[in-house]
Curated annotation (Swiss-Prot):
The modification N6-(pyridoxal phosphate)lysine is found at residue 198. It comes from Salmonella arizonae (strain ATCC BAA-731 / CDC346-86 / RSK2980). This is Phosphoserine aminotransferase. The gene is serC. Homodimer. InterPro entries: Aminotrans_V_dom, Aminotrans_V_PyrdxlP_BS, Pser_aminoTfrase, PyrdxlP-dep_Trfase, PyrdxlP-dep_Trfase_major, PyrdxlP-dep_Trfase_small.
Amino acid sequence: MAQVFNFSSGPAMLPTEVLKLAQQELRDWHDLGTSVMEISHRGKEFIQVAEEAEQDFRDLLSIPSNYKVLFCHGGGRGQFAGVPLNLLGDRTTADYVDAGYWAASAIKEAKKYCAPQIIDAKITVDGKRAVKPMREWQLSDNAAYLHYCPNETIDGIAIDETPDFGPGVVVTADFSSTILSAPLDVSRYGVIYAGAQKNIGPAGLTLVIVREDLLGKAHENCPSILDYTVLNDNDSMFNTPPTFAWYLSGLVFKWLKAQGGVAAMHKINQQKAQLLYGVIDNSDFYRNDVAQANRSRMNVPFQLADNALDKVFLEESFAAGLHALKGHRVVGGMRASIYNAMPIEGVKALTDFMIDFERRHG
């Protein structure tokens, strides 16, 4: 079978080594004669899987001991509700930074529970889309927390700054598309959440990192499966968790540690992004409209000079084993998602194709 590189924004490519191991273990896990999908989540065998996965995740991000890690249902959208339901307390407002599609989606959900103070961080720099630096974010005095999205998958916009607003500001962030791709100072945040389907594992699992002093504040009507305290008190097993996604994510954590950890992966991700943006920037045929300071290393949207060629580009790239390059319906064009599991060889195959496509159609 010819090599295929999957540039999907999520569910995304998984490491080949992980898929091969999962395939080997699928029908007979650890000589039990059953699949890991079939064993009880409360049995000692799966408890070991769960504990190892959490410890490996903690090791990868150097998560401080005063933070809890929760393995949840609901995806990022579930946490759009989970954050206000757990953190508002007796306050009625929170600060929300709007820098793109997913930040705006979080704001829309938050409006069901509070009156969000919206910080419009979208700006233009030299004709390209950008984000205001954090020092220009105007925070309100009465906000229960601050929420932002460090990486916008659709817009291809990243906020790489580390928040430093002082101990009185509870910072929450949607790291769904950038978790484990670069070093992260967890201690600067109150809550970090991430859907698994981009840099962690398959869809169906959501990880939440929550500072323990923020537990016990959930709204009385908060659904139990979104209540951080309930989930923590039950070791993320208040109801049956997505066990197969949890298991596969654990394999990804071990794979990532074997690659040298997050710092090593960050260097590779920088190389991949530089390679792809380099081809775009050195061409009049392709363009990216995000200012360099805010370009995403995970999701690279680009347009062709003649959008009439979009269909041809997608057909030819797919035939060449370069899949899922169609841009989001909101913005059109192309998008290459190059998460941790995408090898640099995949990006090189894409850039070689792009150069050849321009030669033939430019």
